Regions:
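A short helix->loop->beta-strand "cap" motif at the edges of active sites that frequently abuts
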Residues: 183-187
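Electropositive, gly/pro-rich neighborhoods at or near active sites that engage anionic ligands
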Residues: 2-128
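Active-site beta-alpha connecting loops in nucleotide-dependent enzymes
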Residues: 194-207
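Glycine/threonine-rich flexible loop motifs
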Residues: 164-172
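Conserved small/polar residues in nucleotide/adenosyl-binding loops
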Residues: 208-214
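Structural beta-sheet core signal
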Residues: 189-191
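Active-site glycine-rich loop that binds ribose-phosphate moieties when present
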Residues: 132-147, 172
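An anion/phosphate-binding loop that grips the pyrophosphate of nucleotide cofactors and donors
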Residues: 153
């Protein structure tokens, strides 16, 4: 959807909306609807196969309303979501990272140790030994509503989620990073209960390098 329609990635936003549905029949049903993925029996891996319905709904609202923030607000109202979901930026971004087998996740990779560069969220999420993650364009503006929400928050919680492709990107946008650093809110890093491809080489101590951003 992102490549074909030029929109910001809806996947993490869909997951957040589904998680904010309340524990009622309405909320549980809509959470399941948002997370439902089509399974095409005749021609798998084509068309809508494995596409989440929630992504289609979100992108439809974006096209109709012309505003990612407003589209997410309408989606939240439809679902009865408790809370507001905001994008980190309203500009489509590309994420890429360098792969360096055996690298220390708390240190920058020396250029001579980098074996390849992986571009795209879905591809990068399958890699281990990732370092030097970056966004393009690097100077993209943050969503103003997201900056305001951080400034007014009592708690800023990072995670759980895919470490390199869902959590760290928020610290790569300068406006969001600065808002987190100057916020009087308490900060909490929530680790995943199980490791995925991105964090196979990381122990819990590896996450403490986030303090370098303070």
């Amino acid at each position: 959807l992102r490549a074909e329609l030029g929109v910001i990635p809806p996947g993490d936003l869909r997951m957040a909306l589904a998680a904010l549905c309340d524990d009622s029949q309405w909320g549980r049903t809509w959470s399941d609807v948002m997370q439902h993925r089509f399974s095409i029996k005749t021609h798998p891996d084509e068309g809508l196969d494995n596409h989440a319905l929630g992504n289609l709904l979100i992108v439809t609202l974006w096209e109709l309303l012309g505003d990612p923030v407003e589209g997410l607000r309408w989606a939240g109202a439809l679902l009865g979501a408790r809370g507001q979901v905001l994008p980190m930026s309203c500009l489509p971004l590309v994420i890429e990272g360098d792969v360096s087998p055996g690298s220390n996740p708390t240190q920058e990779c020396p250029p001579e140790k980098i074996t390849r560069t992986v571009t795209g969220q879905s591809r990068l999420a399958k890699e281990a030994d990732v370092c030097n993650v970056r966004l393009s364009p690097a100077d993209a503006p943050a969503c103003p509503e997201a900056v305001t929400a951080i400034e007014e928050a009592a708690w800023v919680v990072l995670g759980p989620g895919s470490w390199h492709t869902s959590v760290l990107p928020h610290l790569l946008l300068s406006e969001l990073r600065d808002a987190i650093c100057r916020s009087p809110a308490k900060r909490l890093v929530t680790l995943n209960l199980s490791r995925d491809s991105e964090t196979l080489s990381m122990g819990s101590v590896s996450y403490t390098h986030l303090r370098a951003h303070e």
